[in-house]
Structures are given as structure tokens and as C-alpha cells.
Amino acid sequence: MPELPEVETVRRGLETLVLGQEIVAVTLKVPKMVKTDLETFALTLPGQIIQSVGRRGKYLLIDLGQLVLVSHLRMEGKYLLFPDEVPDNKHFHVFFELKNGSTLVYQDVRKFGTFDLIAKSQLSAFFAKRKLGPEPKKETFKLKTFEAALLSSQKPIKPHLLDQTLVAGLGNIYVDEVLWAAKVHPGTASSRLNKAEIKRLHDETIRILALGIEKGGSTVRTYRNALGADGTMQDYLQVYGQTGKPCPRCGQAIVKLKVGGRGTHICPKCQKKRP
């Protein structure tokens, strides 16, 4: 699944490709992807001009002035721009024809991606309803708030970080990296973390997601950015996907286990389980 660094990289690519372009026609082949009114989606988008492309957590925000098209890539979603003819592909599901003759295509092998066309004034309420946490930046991701939320919860720390309420944008790859960097076992109850561990989790979340953005995201399966290029963050992953390899910190073999139903990579020496 594209996580915050991948979605931010897609955002930057889209802004380069389609900023200022007018949508002249929309073709939708998988109606279930649209979570707001279908007729409004089909009739309102033509004539809209793409004023900016933003992001909140793992959501892309295509700013159309008074309206915002909120796009979530889910597991396999990606955007491609074709300057002329669009080739046949059974995984191409949404087509945005632009005034300059190009077509922005949404591709999704799993068909899990979603679109919500909402008034810009409703955007805050949209994310509040989903209990989306702050962006992982020092200005918005406050240590004291993070600490209070953790200490009041019995949830294991990995599922808690994944649920998007503590901080927006973490997924399975970057959670494993953050937990390893902070020397925290993923099954530890949030309330049992000490202040030093919580500070490390906070600081490493900010650092690692920023590094992921700098490296253009991780291409570990099918991820490509909007320009069709791979990311390079996979070359900097310390624990995710490294089963059997020596821990970069202590040399112990990395192991893979299940936590909260998710495949999880840890160093059993650096990330000791609490008795």
C-alpha cells in the first residue's frame, strides 16, 4: 500500500503534470470507487480546473476551487498521464480527459481505491469523521499529545500506529522501520511504553517519513510515481523485507512474525518483548 512518502511523491508528480489543466470529460468504469454521488461526480467534474494537488495523510487532494476531489490509492492505485492515445488495459478504471488533449488515468489492479468529491468547506469535517491524526511534522505532531494518547490505550503499539489516529501516513513498511529505529517491540501495549521510548517513536516517525519523501518512496512491489519512476527508499530500509539478514545495529538475524494480523519485521535482540 502506498504510504505517506509514496503519496507525497505522487502528489508532486501530479502537480507537475496537470496543474492548471481543465477537465473536459470523465469516464468511470468502476462506479463503486466513487463514494459520493455518482451523477454529481460525472456531471460536475467536466469544466473544472485543477488549481493545486495537495495531500493529507495518505489522501490526495485535487483542488478544483470550491470543490476538492479526495483520492485514496489504497493497495495498488496509481496515476498515469498519456499525452495522446490511451492504450487498452483492464486495470485502467477512471479517465480524466484534459483540455490539452492528454488523459490522466487512474489504474488499480485491486479496485480498492476511492474518490470523494466534496465541497472544500467540508474537508475538515471529512477528516475529523475519520479521526485522522496530525501530519508527521514537528509543528503539528506534538509529543505531549502523542504521549497522552499512548499511555491511555492498551492497544499494541504497531496496530495503534497503523490506525492513523495518532499520526497520519504510517503503513506497514514505515511502522516496522520506526519501531526498529526506536528499539520498541511491535506487540508492546501502548500504555506500557516509557517516556524515552515514546520520544524515540515520535522523533523517528518524523525522521523516517521525511527520509521516505526525500528518496521518492519505496518500490517494494508495484509502486511507481506519477512520472512512472521507481522510488529508492527500499535501498534504505533497515528491517522491512530483511528477514534472515543481520540487523544493521547488532548483527542478530531479522525475523518476521505476525502482529495484529500483519507481517512484521523485527530484530529480536534490539526489540525485546516485555515479560
From Swiss-Prot:
One MF annotation (Gene Ontology) recorded for this entry: 8-oxo-7,8-dihydroguanine DNA N-glycosylase activity
Keyword DNA repair: yes
Catalysed reactions, semicolon-separated: Hydrolysis of DNA containing ring-opened 7-methylguanine residues, releasing 2,6-diamino-4-hydroxy-5-(N-methyl)formamidopyrimidine; 2'-deoxyribonucleotide-(2'-deoxyribose 5'-phosphate)-2'-deoxyribonucleotide-DNA = a 3'-end 2'-deoxyribonucleotide-(2,3-dehydro-2,3-deoxyribose 5'-phosphate)-DNA + a 5'-end 5'-phospho-2'-deoxyribonucleoside-DNA + H(+)
Zinc finger (FPG-type): 238-272
Keywords: DNA damage, DNA repair, DNA-binding, Glycosidase, Hydrolase, Lyase, Metal-binding, Multifunctional enzyme, Zinc, Zinc-finger
Cofactor(s) the protein requires to work: Zn(2+)
Entries under SUPFAM superfamilies matching the protein: Glucocorticoid receptor-like (DNA-binding domain), N-terminal domain of MutM-like DNA repair proteins, S13-like H2TH domain
Classification via PROSITE patterns: FPG_CAT, ZF_FPG_1, ZF_FPG_2
EC number(s) recorded for this UniProt protein: 3.2.2.23, 4.2.99.18
Co-factor note (free text): Binds 1 zinc ion per subunit.
Alphabetical list of InterPro entries matching this protein: DNA_glyclase/AP_lyase_DNA-bd, DNA_glyclase_Znf_dom_DNA_BS, Formamido-pyr_DNA_Glyclase, FPG_cat, MutM-like_N-ter, Ribosomal_uS13-like_H2TH, Znf_DNA_glyclase/AP_lyase, Znf_FPG/IleRS
Residues at the active site: 2 (schiff-base intermediate with dna), 3 (proton donor), 58 (proton donor), 262 (proton donor)
UniProt: DNA binding residues: 91, 110
Family: Belongs to the FPG family.
Quaternary assembly: Monomer.
Its job: Involved in base excision repair of DNA damaged by oxidation or by mutagenic agents. Acts as a DNA glycosylase that recognizes and removes damaged bases. Has a preference for oxidized purines, such as 7,8-dihydro-8-oxoguanine (8-oxoG). Has AP (apurinic/apyrimidinic) lyase activity and introduces nicks in the DNA strand. Cleaves the DNA backbone by beta-delta elimination to generate a single-strand break at the site of the removed base with both 3'- and 5'-phosphates.
NCBIfam families, per the entry: fpg, PRK01103.1
Name of this protein: Formamidopyrimidine-DNA glycosylase
Lineage summary: Bacteria, Bacillati, Bacillota, Bacilli, Lactobacillales
